[in-house]
From Swiss-Prot:
Claim: Ribonucleoprotein is one of the keywords in the record: yes
Keyword hit for Iron-sulfur: no
Residue ranges, compositional bias (Low complexity): 76-93
Organism in which the protein naturally occurs: Alternaria alternata
Main function: Plays an important role in the elongation step of protein synthesis.
GO biological process: cytoplasmic translational elongation
Keyword set, alphabetical order: Allergen, Phosphoprotein, Ribonucleoprotein, Ribosomal protein
Protein's name according to its UniProt entry: Large ribosomal subunit protein P2
Subunit relationships: P1 and P2 exist as dimers at the large ribosomal subunit.
Gene Ontology cellular-component annotations: cytosolic large ribosomal subunit
Gene of this entry: ALTA5
Phosphoserine, modified sites: 103
Amino acid sequence: MKHLAAYLLLGLGGNTSPSAADVKAVLESVGIEADSDRLDKLISELEGKDINELIASGSEKLASVPSGGAGGAAASGGAAAAGGSAQAEAAPEAAKEEEKEESDEDMGFGLFD
């Protein structure tokens, strides 16, 4: 990834076809040791290709891949809202039942009235 980042920096700087030596110089300028095998592979893969076209192509491919995370969150959010309203309805009924039970506990002797 660091090799690709250096390659892209050189491209942004105006070098349309950076060499392995150019990429190595960028990496060494910030204290990173370049892996010559990976660097040679990167240079051979990108040789003769336009960086902007590669980025656009990659963006199209990423956009076509479904992420899957948003659908489940929306479904679970709706289920939680439905479950929450059912619990909210049950709570007042439970409170009414408790009040009736409390009034029965003193057996009609209102000691603290």
